[in-house]
Amino acid sequence: NALHSAGLICRSKRGRYLPNPVFLKKLEGFTPHAVLSEIVRPILEQLSVALETTTHFGILENDMVTYLAKAVFEGEEVFTREKGQLEAYCSAIGKVLLSHMTVDERQAYITSGPFPKLTDKTITDPAEIERELHRTRIRGFGVDDGEVHNALYCIAVPVFTSRGMVVGAISSSSSQRWASPKEQRDRLIQLNGVAQSISSTLGAGA
């Protein structure tokens, strides 16, 4: 048994194995979120350089987006921070994650308002938020066009597990709006490629 040979498990009796206490001790302090952060961060750093923007990986926690990892491109610092949170209904990552909720979960969220207006572009009407989430799900990406902050423009795509579940989302964020639809498409191509790479890194058990 490879796991036994590597010292990761120990045999308690014939046919029964348990985690090696020494191995468990080494894992103290590691949570699933911490592991995800360590896996994703170096990939985000490469993406940030390629896109020349700040990149994020986020998950949904208590109806808020939590940023588990962030990579900054020089000169493109934005106000977000790792382990910090933003509203989901108006952020690109949040729209992606909300759009992949079950119908009942999404309906519960939509009826949980009110939804504060953060900028002139923030969508706050529950019916319009629902339509925006539907558009996000259909097209496969989320957009924050100055809805969280007047000088913040983001585009995000989902990261799937091998079983088709959404484990999080990655985004490209900049203080400059994309110059053209082509630039947006180019970003999406790279974002989707990286999302697939993260899925592969997580492995078949994810």
Tell me the role of every PLM-derived stretch.
Residues N1-S37, Q196-A204:
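N-terminal helix-turn-helix
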Residues K13, E61, G168:
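A cytosolic small-molecule/anion-sensing beta-strand core signal
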Residues L18-S112:
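Amphipathic alpha-helical effector-binding/dimerization core
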Residues F23-K26, F115-P116, S175-A179:
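A short, flexible beta-alpha/helix-coil linker loop
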Residues G29, L118-T119:
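Short hinge/gating elements
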Residues D104-Y109, P116-K117, R139, V143:
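Short, structured loop/turn "capping" segments at alpha-beta junctions
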Residues A108, G113-P114, N192-A206:
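Cysteine/selenocysteine-centered motifs that mediate thiol-based redox chemistry or coordinate metal-sulfur cofactors
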Residues K121-V194:
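Extended hydrophobic
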